[in-house]
UniProtKB/Swiss-Prot annotation:
Presence of the UniProt keyword Repeat in the record: yes
PANTHER family: NADH DEHYDROGENASE [UBIQUINONE] IRON-SULFUR PROTEIN 8, MITOCHONDRIAL (PTHR10849:SF20), NADH DEHYDROGENASE UBIQUINONE IRON-SULFUR PROTEIN 8, MITOCHONDRIAL (PTHR10849)
Xref: Pfam families: Fer4_7
Cofactor: [4Fe-4S] cluster
Membrane topology designation: Peripheral membrane protein
Paired cysteines (S-S): none
Superkingdom assignment: Bacteria
Family, as annotated: Belongs to the complex I 23 kDa subunit family.
Protein name: NADH-quinone oxidoreductase subunit I
Length: 162
């Protein structure tokens, strides 16, 4: 070992320089947030938990066109259309999304001509079993009812870019 290397090892110069570097950043404001108690604002384009929307009169928006089912790359959406009603429109009898398969790409939302299926702002939907991640029509409509205000605001903010 050379004298220079021995001197550096004895004086712990690397340790001291690392200590001063740590002290320099120690007194600066924190760059992180205290997550469960503080949350960053999310983008209007954020893709979270799926929801089915309703019209203001309470009627569901989905017209059973099955475009979302056809475009889904993960084949996570299953739709069964009911018979045509007297006014010629159709509604879904069954609308299921397998959230385990879903890759949250947003193609279903883009394909929907009536903005019925959307990916809402909720990202905290952890479950204890896989079966709870199979969303049926009732669960999706409940999500839509719960998050309608935030979803409508996000769609309005994103409208100039659509």
């Amino acid at each position: 070992m050379s004298i220079n290397a021995t001197a550096r090892a004895l004086l712990l110069t690397e340790f001291v320089s690392a200590f001063f570097l740590t002290m320099r950043y120690f007194f600066q404001p924190k760059a992180t947030i205290n997550y469960p108690f503080e949350k960053n604002p999310i983008s209007p384009r954020f893709r979270g938990e799926h929801a089915l929307r309703r019209y203001p009169n309470g009627e569901e928006r989905c017209i059973a066109c099955k475009l979302c089912e056809a475009i889904c790359p993960a084949q996570a959406i299953t739709i069964e259309a009911g018979p045509r009603r007297n006014d010629g429109t159709r509604r879904t009898v069954r609308y299921d999304i397998d959230m385990v398969k879903c890759i949250y790409c947003g193609l279903c939302q883009e394909a929907c001509p009536v903005d019925a299926i959307v990916e809402g702002p909720n990202f905290e939907f952890a479950t204890e079993t896989r079966e709870e991640l199979y969303y049926d029509k009732a669960k999706l409509l409940a999500n839509g009812d719960r998050w309608e205000r935030e979803i409508a605001k996000a769609i309005e903010l994103d409208a100039p870019y659509r």
